[in-house]
């Protein structure tokens, strides 16, 4: 059939509402080209490592697909000429990746964890109070 690819897209945060329509267009192109989508993840808005076009956040999407080279070329051209897509990356993979990505796993785990206590909840007003047995007034050298 085709080759396996992993594609990550960074979409302009103002275009988050149009993400589903964009995905439907890309899905149709892949399926019309006799390709398969093995995994599709919407990571949502995330902080960027560095500003892109003066933006500090972007909407992330990740796909694992199996397509012919010609279909991939069409997809990349669509990504390149779509102003809503800030960055795109297509990587050739050795096979289909269908299990959940690390980012989605960590998102799920966050929902399962109990809420962490804040540091200021821990300290019950004892800020600045020292224990005299631990603090000898800085005379450790003289002793």
Curated annotation (Swiss-Prot):
Gene Ontology molecular function: any one? structural constituent of ribosome
Locate the compositionally biased regions of type Basic and acidic residues.
Answer: 105-121
Gene Ontology biological process terms in this record: translation
The record's GO CC annotations read:
cytosolic small ribosomal subunit
SUPFAM superfamilies, A to Z: Ribosomal protein S6
Q: Which residues cross the membrane?
A: none
Keywords from the UniProt entry: Ribonucleoprotein, Ribosomal protein, RNA-binding, rRNA-binding
Region: Disordered; residue ranges are 100-143
Which residues fall in a compositionally biased region of kind Low complexity? 126-143
Sequence similarity? Belongs to the bacterial ribosomal protein bS6 family.
Task performed by this protein: Binds together with bS18 to 16S ribosomal RNA.
Stated name of the protein: Small ribosomal subunit protein bS6
């Amino acid at each position: 059939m085709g080759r396996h690819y992993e594609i990550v897209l960074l979409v302009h945060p103002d275009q988050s509402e149009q993400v589903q329509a964009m995905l439907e267009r890309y899905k149709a192109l892949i399926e019309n080209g006799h390709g398969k989508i093995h995994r599709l993840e919407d990571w949502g808005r995330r902080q960027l490592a560095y500003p892109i076009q003066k933006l500090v956040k972007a909407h992330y999407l990740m796909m694992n697909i199996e397509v012919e080279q010609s279909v991939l070329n069409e997809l990349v051209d669509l990504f390149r000429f779509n102003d809503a897509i800030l960055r795109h990356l297509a990587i050739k993979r050795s096979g289909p990746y269908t299990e959940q990505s690390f980012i989605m796993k960590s998102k799920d785990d966050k929902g399962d964890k109990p809420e962490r206590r804040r540091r200021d909840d821990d300290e019950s007003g004892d800020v600045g109070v020292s224990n005299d047995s631990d603090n000898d007034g800085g005379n450790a050298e003289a002793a």
